[in-house]
Amino acid sequence: MKCKLLVAEDELIERKVLCKTLQKYLGDLIVLYEARNGREALELFAREAPQVVILDIEMPGYTGLEVARKIRETDKNCGILFLTGYDKFAYAKQAIAVRALDYLLKPYKEQELVFAVEDAIRQVSAQRTPLPPRA
């Protein structure tokens, strides 16, 4: 079964490049949803229930950190990744507080992004797959 992945990025070109990269390397593993801002991200999250979410930190509507906090209220296992141009320690600390799986800085290398998403998919899949009963 394919993993549902939500990308929330307010910059159109950045979002399109990000989605194109994900489709190129992981297209057979993912179903991709795109949000232009934090509010749209929350609407898509509620409707589609993606297993992995990539959030920009600074977006209109709600920031990526606010979106992550709201996601955590209903889904403790969603794989959250931050992709941001802000190299601020305070943001990184807040990302840790919402149990983000990764915090990538722009500009990113394609392989760095792909590895982070693959790792998130693995972690989320392991959490959601019931363990077999002990013998």
Predicted regions and their residues:
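Alpha-helical/coil-rich non-catalytic "connector" segments in signaling and regulatory proteins
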Residues: 1-134
